[in-house]
Amino acid sequence: MIVINIKENEPIDKALKRFKKKFEKTGVLKALRARSYYEKKSVRLRKEVIRASYRLKLQEAASND
């Protein structure tokens, strides 16, 4: 359960923004979307390999700059 303490005289926009950040960090929505349909283990592993290679490319590009 996510708890946000609203400070005195704090605009609701800022409190809502903090709530959204905390909610995004927990990864609840991401997990919910991932479980919305069944995904075979081989497909999941293939996606992980693709993501890992993409991150590696980004790291190499950043180190070359």
From Swiss-Prot:
Disulfide bonds: none
InterPro entries for this protein: Ribosomal_bS21, Ribosomal_bS21_CS, Ribosomal_bS21_sf
GO cellular component terms, A-Z: ribonucleoprotein complex; ribosome
Keywords: Ribonucleoprotein, Ribosomal protein
GO molecular function: structural constituent of ribosome
Top-level taxon of origin: Bacteria
Coiled-coil ranges from the UniProt annotation: none
One matching Pfam family: Ribosomal_S21
GO biological process, one term: translation
Family: Belongs to the bacterial ribosomal protein bS21 family.
UniProt name for this protein: Small ribosomal subunit protein bS21
Organism: Cytophaga hutchinsonii (strain ATCC 33406 / DSM 1761 / CIP 103989 / NBRC 15051 / NCIMB 9469 / D465)
